Amino acid sequence: MSKATLAIYGIKDRNQLHYPAYTHDHNLCLMQDGRVLQYLQLERYTRRKYDNRLDLFLEELIDKGLLQLPEEFDLVSVNAFVGNAFITSGGKLRFEANRLSHLSENLESAWGYYQYETWQGREIEAYNCSQELAHIASCLPFYGAFQENSLLVHLDGAASLSNFSAFLYKGGKIQLLEYGWEMKYLANFYNDNALSFAMIGAAPGEHTSVPGKLMGYACWGDYRADIEQWLAEHNYFKEYWHREEEIFASIAETFGLSIESFNSTIPFWQDVAATLQHIFSREVIDKFCQLQQQTGARYLYYAGGCALNIVTNTQLLETGLFEQVYIPPCCNDSGLSLGAASLCEWLKGNTIATHSPYLNTLGLIPPQQQFSSELITDIAKLLMAGKVLGVCNGFGEAGPRALGNRSLLALANDKKLAERVSIHIKKREWYRPIAPIMLAEIVQEVASTPIQPLAKYMLMDFHIKDDYRAALAGVVHVNGTARIQVIESKDDNPLMYALLSHLYKEYGVLALINTSFNVRGEPIIHRPVEALAAMPRMGLDGVVIEYKLYLPDGLEEDRDLVR
């Protein structure tokens, strides 16, 4: 048994704000012999969305026994462009490293100290990991070792020394190809652009929520070459903060339109969003084409926040550039510690095991995963009656997507029901799509898009055949696509497989709405007690907690359904 690896992403932000600024989504991962022992996105524990205060909570997690550190472990810290050092609030865990001057193909030696008891501590073996490598290596715990002749790419808003980096895995080694900031302007569309923020009504502190909103909004419009030219001439209006009147005046002069607000129902803004998305997809895919031609790579491993762009992912798959494309479920910063720990374990010579996405473990009791057929029948009856149910089973998902363990479920055939879930329960904007969960054999029937590994993690779109759009009305977006989570077998998620199979066999139901168990601005539910408290607060019709069904007080008609 090799020494364990503790990896952290906890670089301190530059500003003491009530929201994350330059760093966000702090997380930690403990691995040994290639297996994840414990993992936590900090927000799930603290209940503060995108929480970036790991320095304030790490000692608490250790002292409470939630993070079960062995006597001996190696420490890996993921750095950021804002810095390298990490120290806990009480000084018990310390990490220091030299500032990176160039992007490495390896971990960099650093200095670490761990005080395991009062007045007793020791130096520990420590390594500094770039965000670029940590992002890419976050593929390892979900897809296993990199395949020979693979392109490894990271793309996000800002990492350690770049926002875009590319490596080639060949001959058992990671070889750096390039890194830099040339594609930063594209990422800025989604996290640092005055026009984008204004169109979707986002305040500066809400930058972490902009990408998902803008991608959903873009599907309502159409690409226009004249809008692209206008955007380019004004540097995409990136710095036009609080200069709305100048933007409106430019529209009037260029297009002859009188627009005086950023009302999201105005078609011009929808076309602007669609044009930004078109530019992003075109330029990113062109870059992948260039790198594939340069290297002859057969496979692509892709991570970073930009890998959550579903439209681009789908178009990339459709090019057929690579034999296979791999993106992890936690491809944004929430997966950095998983990547760093996996990279360190791999460099130690350990084989990285293939894991399920259900890795958020701290503070939770190991799941039983045993349920009765009566539970499936009862859940199905409630869903067929138009009810909305929450699910909190086992460990939580790694990353921003709910994949059946921390989900809200409802029938997928009703737009009104979908609006209830998305707008009234989750408090989301009208233009954002809501996604389904579906058995693989049903996907092959209703969609014209081939199933890819990304579908297991809701990271691609499927084009829904016309004949099935009415039966899936609640989850088909305005552009005729659906971001399906595909369930291949009961091993993916036993309860969801059993439920979907029962619903199809008994009622002909093709899919369910599957969206994250939270409301806008809050983290996904983590602990059972939170799920139970959320039921009345969110107006849910019931919750399934550790494979038991709970109904709100006073709903006797629902109790009659499941007796």
Which residues are covered by each model-predicted region?
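Active-site cores of enzymes that catalyze phosphoryl transfer or operate on phosphate-rich substrates
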Residues: 216-278
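Phosphate/ATP-binding catalytic cores across multiple sugar-kinase/actin-like superfamilies
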Residues: 274-300
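Glycine-rich phosphate-binding loops at beta-strand->alpha-helix junctions
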Residues: 299-316
